[in-house]
UniProtKB/Swiss-Prot annotation:
Keywords: Membrane, NAD, NADP, Plastoquinone, Quinone, Thylakoid, Translocase, Transmembrane, Transmembrane helix
Enzyme class: translocase
Recorded name of the encoding gene: ndhD
Protein name from the UniProt record: NAD(P)H-quinone oxidoreductase chain 4
The reaction(s) this protein catalyses: a plastoquinone + NADH + (n+1) H(+)(in) = a plastoquinol + NAD(+) + n H(+)(out); a plastoquinone + NADPH + (n+1) H(+)(in) = a plastoquinol + NADP(+) + n H(+)(out)
Domain of life, source organism: Bacteria
A GO cellular component entry from the record: plasma membrane-derived thylakoid membrane
Membrane-spanning residues: 12-32, 44-64, 96-116, 120-140, 144-164, 176-196, 220-240, 251-271, 285-305, 314-334, 340-360, 384-404, 425-445, 472-492
Length: 534
């Protein structure tokens, strides 16, 4: 009996269910009555988000083999055969951790949205649609379908910013849609070019595209376009300016989705398309990714240090931390690339926690100006403890996930003999500046908010209250995996190391075809390097 049950579970369409269930359930919300404060809708949305999370966990437990480098849990249904479009979903090591992260963060974002009273039906409808759409981005195995799911999440984010944002919400929402929708045209053009390459019958499946022998010039053209599109979402400096504005106007649950999931779509796509499907071009552009990553780290850290607005300070901190993802993707070692994957998971958890606390603090103080926040630690001691724990995680304290992921990226890049020693030393030294700046601006932020002379106007008028159980629970749920990964990173790395090793081997093979510059080590130009193991 149990064998039959196990076989049935392994054949269950886990990924399709995790995508379609929250979207289909969202369609029920308009039929809820408009009376009251939306209590029924909130409980319904939370139930759907939790069930979706359980479905994704079920997909990992019942059908995913961590030692298998290939796509698993694959479902392939012909959709529009004349256009070469199929409903093709699956998961490998690069997508499964992010699928789990998406459903987990979304469930907590629904709980974070509990105080939302304005248009709750529309708000939770959009959250659930985003849940399914973002899971689809990581699960689809067809490039044209990827483009459609990539675009699907734009409308919910735009509406969540434009309707529930701050006083400059229309500007922030418009800027977001212009940047992201405008850059997405490059994804569509690359998908069509790659799908029709060398054939009159289009095929957009990743497995087909990976087997194609694209010419070097073709790969370079597609790589540049995709780098722009995904660089906007990551974001890469100077394509980042939409993010501080979006974070500056968003509410706490939208913050969590932006920082926890949306930015990771850019990093995942760079790995999936630029590094995996266009390896020859990636071998040539990898040094540029390293440089851009260092620029991200230093520029955003310096800018964050100068910010006096709490939301914008944390937003630039996110941009800085995503620079480590770029360095990891640009390295040709499995340790560095594995560090990039872990950094995406780690920052998803840490970024969501910090932005939730920003929202919770604003709800009490009604200000984001650090100059107006002072001495609230006496009134909000639990909130101070939560802020301290999450800030220590963000500055990569040993024992927390950020320390492990950044150490893996640094070590992987510094020991990567594909690059010359001077290049590695210079880039690592510059990136270290950002590592030094991070604790400075985060600890000074804590000092300005919670210590110093009390602001009588703030203390008396706002009647500050400490963190409530719901808020403590959300942060505890985020800190638990942050500390767990920091103490035992194999909890996550084991799920993707086989896929990462396969990706790195493919890219190292392409190094032979790369443009020979002084950046690449001369002793390694004419041989295929063996990827170091973790």
């Amino acid at each position: 009996m149990f064998g039959t049950l196990g076989a049935g579970l392994s054949n269950f369409p886990w990924l399709s269910a995790s995508i379609l269930f929250p979207i289909g359930s969202a369609l029920v919300i308009p039929f809820f009555p408009d009376k009251g404060d939306g209590k029924e809708v909130r409980w319904f949305a939370l139930s759907i988000a939790l069930i979706t999370f359980l479905i994704t966990v079920g997909s990992y437990i019942n059908g995913f083999d961590i030692n298998n480098e290939n796509v698993q849990l694959k479902e392939n249904i012909s959709w529009l055969p004349d256009l070469g479009l199929t409903w093709s979903v699956g998961a490998d090591g690069m997508s499964m951790p992010l699928i789990l992260l998406t459903s987990f963060i979304t469930a907590l974002a629904v709980l974070a949205a509990w105080p939302v009273k304005f248009k709750p039906k529309l708000f939770f409808f959009l959250i659930l649609v985003m849940d399914g759409g973002q899971i689809a981005v990581f699960a689809v195995q067809d490039m044209l379908l990827f483009f459609l799911t990539w675009e699907l999440e734009l409308i919910p984010v735009y509406l969540l910013l434009a309707i529930w944002g701050g006083k400059n919400r229309q500007y922030a929402a418009t800027k977001f849609i212009i940047y992201t929708a405008g850059s997405s045209i490059f994804i569509l053009l690359a998908a069509l070019a790659m799908g029709f390459y060398g054939t009159e019958i289009p095929n957009f499946e990743f497995s087909h595209l990976a087997a194609q022998d694209f010419s070097q010039k073709f790969q370079i053209l597609c790589y540049v376009g995709l780098l722009i599109a995904f660089g906007v979402k990551l974001p890469i400096v100077p394509l980042h300016t939409w993010l501080p504005d979006a974070h500056g106007e968003a509410t706490a649950p939208v913050h969590m989705l932006l920082a926890g999931i949306l930015l990771k779509m850019g990093g995942y796509a760079l790995l999936r398309f630029n590094a995996q499907l266009l390896p020859v071009a990636h071998a040539q552009f990898a040094p540029l990714l390293i440089v851009l990553g260092v620029v991200n780290i230093i520029y955003a850290a310096l800018t964050s240090f100068a910010q006096r607005n709490l939301k914008r300070k944390i937003a630039y901190s996110s941009i800085s931390h995503m620079g480590f993802v770029l360095i990891g993707i640009g390295s040709f070692s499995s340790l560095g690339t594995s560090g990039a994957m872990l950094q995406m998971v780690s920052h998803g958890l840490i970024g969501a926690s910090l932005f939730f606390l920003v929202g919770a603090t604003y709800d009490r103080t009604k200000t984001l100006k650090l100059d107006e926040m002072s001495g609230v630690g006496q009134k909000m001691r639990i909130m101070f403890a939560l802020w301290t724990a999450c800030s220590l995680a963000s500055l990569a304290l040993p024992g927390m996930s950020g320390f492990v992921s950044e150490l893996m990226v640094f070590t992987g890049f510094v020991t990567d003999e594909v690059y010359t020693l001077p290049f590695r030393v210079v880039m690592a030294s510059l990136a270290a500046i950002g590592v030094i700046l991070t604790p400075i601006y985060l600890l000074s932020m804590l000092r300005e908010i919670f210590f110093g002379k009390e602001n009588p106007k703030l203390i008396e008028e706002r009647k500050l209250i400490d963190a409530e159980p719901r808020e403590v629970y959300i942060i505890a749920c985020l800190l638990l995996p942050i500390i767990g990964i920091g103490l035992y990173p194999r909890l996550v790395t084991e799920s993707y190391i086989a896929s990462i090793n396969n990706l790195v081997d493919r890219d190292l093979t392409a190094v032979k075809s790369a443009v020979k510059t002084n950046i690449f080590s001369g002793t390694k130009k004419n041989e295929i390097l063996k990827a170091p193991t973790i």
